[in-house]
Amino acid sequence: MPKSNLEIIRSTYEGSASSNAKHLEEALSEKVEWTEAEGFPYGGTYIGVEAIMENVFSRLGSEWDDYKASVNMYHEVNGKDVIIAEGVYSGGYKETGKLFEADFVHVWQLENGKIVKFKQYVDSYIVREAMKV
């Protein structure tokens, strides 16, 4: 039986970092549109898995220690292929050693069991403060 949209999105947050990444890559559509919030260090819209991995996830992995996105609540939008995740980012910026916690909301749009669009909302000021020397 195919996974529900909620199960697909939960699988990208609730395992180990490596299993979350594997599940995310499997769930992304070929031409997924991924938008990081304006003001966030990696802000912008990226099209396709390669662009997302290069501009977002490789940087998160190389520039931060123990960077996490912990979800507190999921919302499934009835009649739409949309899942909303509310949670908290945390981690330490390697260059400064500063730790942070910042609230986020992620909006996921799916089609036929694949993620076609992602949009991030976050208090980017807190993240940028952790990056300041």
What is each of the regions a protein language model found here?
Residues 5-6, 41, 90:
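A short, structure-level motif marking secondary-structure boundaries and short turns
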Residues 9-12, 23-25, 32, 48, ...:
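Hydrophobic pocket/interface hotspot
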Residues 13-24, 49, 67-72, 91-92:
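Phosphate-binding glycine-rich loops and adjacent basic patches that engage nucleotide phosphates
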Residues 29-78:
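A solvent-exposed, acidic/Ser-Thr-rich amphipathic alpha-helical stretch
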Residues 57-133:
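A beta-strand edge to alpha-helix "cap/lid" segment located at domain peripheries
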